[in-house]
């Protein structure tokens, strides 16, 4: 299973919109933009975090600088949305301040009708996964869109090998087991070659018929943070290992997933 070309957008509009009900836009303390890496304002936002969490701490205190460095690192780890080396190291960022995060957390805790802003933060990613996992992912129709590679048009265009299937946790139980799998792949490759030689659609139909559900398919998926929140909460303990990989990807690579997806408070070690 692979996750590639991930992009996240919509933080600025979503967090501005969450302040619409009380017209509290002047209280926003987040910064968004496109800057060279060395010019990013993460330390400015980090200072806001230090002052919000330690209001009695003097700016000249050594601890202030230590905390500011920690918050700046946390902001870089979460707030860098896109880094493009081909464009002179420009970085797209969304550094969320403590006031905006506090409001966001209160809205998320209040329920789905209040956390509408999560549905305005969009994620796009190319996922390569077996067909049996995609069947379960298709349960999530509302708010998600997927554009897949075509099994119908492209299945016969490349050789069929073991690498075409999900083998992340593949176990060779014994020689007989491995032999049967190898024979199945040889059979599928035979059908593919016969179709290419004869253009007889009956071979193509048999290839489709006997293709295992472990066949890897790539889809470009768009979804929002509310989708991620639902999926990760519902599938965290699923017996399919691919769901654990999905949850792990969200946890490790999706910006601010700890707070916006898993509901954890901002806590620095």
Predicted regions and their residues:
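Family-specific signature for flavin-dependent thymidylate synthase
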Residues: 1-269
């Amino acid at each position: 299973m692979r996750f590639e070309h991930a992009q996240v957008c919509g933080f600025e509009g979503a967090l501005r919109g969450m302040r619409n009900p009380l017209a509290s836009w002047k209280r926003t303390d987040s910064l968004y933009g496109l800057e060279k890496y060395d010019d990013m304002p993460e330390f400015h936002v980090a200072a806001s975090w230090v002052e919000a969490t330690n209001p009695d701490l003097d700016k000249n205190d050594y601890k202030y600088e230590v905390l500011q460095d920690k918050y700046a690192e946390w902001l870089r780890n979460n707030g860098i949305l896109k880094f493009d080396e081909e464009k002179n190291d420009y970085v797209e960022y969304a550094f969320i301040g403590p006031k905006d995060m506090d409001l966001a957390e209160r809205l998320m805790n209040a329920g789905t009708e209040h956390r509408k802003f999560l549905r305005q933060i969009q994620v796009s990613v190319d996922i390569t996964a077996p067909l049996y996992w995609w069947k379960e992912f298709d349960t999530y129709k509302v708010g998600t869109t997927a554009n897949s590679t075509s099994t119908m048009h492209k299945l016969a265009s490349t050789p069929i090998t073991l690498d075409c299937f999900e083998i992340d946790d593949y176990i060779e139980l014994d020689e007989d087991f491995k032999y049967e799998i190898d024979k199945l792949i040889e059979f599928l490759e035979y059908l593919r070659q016969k179709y290419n030689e004869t253009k007889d659609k009956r071979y193509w139909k048999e290839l489709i018929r006997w293709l295992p559900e472990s066949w890897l398919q790539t889809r470009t998926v768009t979804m929002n943070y509310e989708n991620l929140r639902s999926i990760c909460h519902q599938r965290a303990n699923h017996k399919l290992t691919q769901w654990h990989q999905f949850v792990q990807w969200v946890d490790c690579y999706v910006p601010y997933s700890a707070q916006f997806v898993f509901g954890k408070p901002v806590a620095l070690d």
